[in-house]
């Protein structure tokens, strides 16, 4: 029996779970049904933009528009099915027909069409399938599909659509717009997974042809947030540029297993290179990236990174291995006659790097930092960070720290791998500490407001075997015991303070030296007191400048230090050295670093500091400090070591100051913030003993926006430039070095980045890179060329490592990169936010 029902009557009928409501749809559903095999034209793209809800907006500078949000008001019951239509022909046992402005809603799923057919199970009379035809629009949260035909299965909420134009929202951190595309067929499974046949996929705006994936099929796993494209082509401006049988990409912020975009690039030391990274999301808190890497000049390298995060630990393991390096083999063959020390080196190149931090308990922590490379040239040949090419000391350290309310205990093992490239200035190895045991106590609640601080430390120093300099293999080594109790009584008032302090330094050494004829031993014990008196005053006044109210402070400070002289030249130098003199050194109790040299002192430091503080916020606008030390006696303790007990430090040693002049250099420091975007800092130290500048630095930082940055810096250090000269000798000269770096937008989408470091003393550049970056709505590109000083050649002319970095980021899909220059940019452009940085 056929029943023709008008919209008014339809609203009153409720039959077998189908609730019909007569809500006339005033706005027709905009359909964009075009067969999948039809190529896109500009007119079709314009039509698609309307169908997908695209709103052009020139005030949106990046994407030039936005999508209307997809909103669906859910029904009260998720199992309820509601159907609206202008007319219906209903059959109890046959197919029912709905016509005119048909709308079906089940939960948060809505389907619109001009015609619908309802199918029932002949036995149970339940609706098993609803078929929609003509101008079909399929909506659910974050999903829109416009199709020629759709079939919905209400019982398990699955369905499929044909000749589809779709829009799927993504939750990717770098995707600004939802994904959209076309497919000949889309299946929606009961678990909300999707299968797309003969499909395209892009996150560009509908009228933007920048990139798209065209695949035989695309599977989208909703729970895992992963998409897999099979037999896929990457099209750039509709031109096919890459084919891959398998491509995995994320559809949300979660990490996904799968192949990443290929790595491409070029360098003068490795040649052209190609890598195919595979990312393995092993668990929510474990992952691994494997990268087979082909270098045309060297061979095939296998690299990988393993990361983990547990309730107690976090860490990263990096490793690379390249067997039988062709270029390195030629290098060894060409140089082994002149440099016999490289004879027999393996051509297998490798690197391991392990960093771990484990919190066993709230007060017990383990830290590990280990790095090792196969040979002295590995970083020069393979480092992708221009700042690391000239690194010569690789740290290997593990420490276990236990902390209580008043004490800190630490056990540590530490050593370094020292790299010795040929025809470069030799670098001395660093003593190993195997182990170091430390205990530090601090009590600040003693009678008379006194503070007691005590440090006890045991170090077992071991000189590493160094085949490059046999003469150094009889270096002193052995244990050192250090004890340093300090008692101070700070007396604080709002207008100033006075802090008398007394302390003792106790060092004990058990020294051995290995010779060809045997081992020599010696013991040394040293007990030295230190007395100091520190005092300062606080003055302040109100200041009104250019419409802003400030508080200006004036803070004079005096610091008297008395340390008696003890001859220490018999004692080896394990970790002591001269320090660069600046404002911070005015109030130190020891002019040497480390514990092996306790400088004698009878001196008075005097300094003056002034600050400008904004009255409302308390933010510091500016500060300036200047000070000097008046010596009442000559400084007799020398850094040098001699078995005779007598030696004199070389006056040209870096950081060494006159030991006879009556005053120290004048140290000054200034910090000024012109506004929140513009600031300047600088140190200037003038030495009256030489009537010349001892050291200076000036740094400028301008950042009016997140990635609009200009940095400039200049450094000058007396004897800070060690130069290799003929006959393998070296000489110390003043270091003049300048650096300029910038990241600056050239337009809404284009920006430039670059840095340049120049050694004025030697008249050549140390590092430089320059690049341009394009950042649009759905993709970004960066090309960066750079070079860094590597070494001097036989004519003492600079040699460089040259690299070209190419990065292409397809937002919502992945990136193509020759390597990751994020380390370079973060090092040389402070404050820079890298949109390509992996997160």
Swiss-Prot record:
InterPro entries hit by this protein: LipoPS_assembly_LptD, LptD, LptD_C, OstA-like_N
GO cellular component, one term: transporter complex
Location within or outside the cell: Cell outer membrane
Signal peptide feature range: 1-21
Complexes and interactors: Component of the lipopolysaccharide transport and assembly complex. Interacts with LptE and LptA.
Functional note: Together with LptE, is involved in the assembly of lipopolysaccharide (LPS) at the surface of the outer membrane.
Family recorded in the similarity comment: Belongs to the LptD family.
Name of the protein described by the UniProt record: LPS-assembly protein LptD
Source species of the chain: Legionella pneumophila (strain Paris)
Gene: lptD
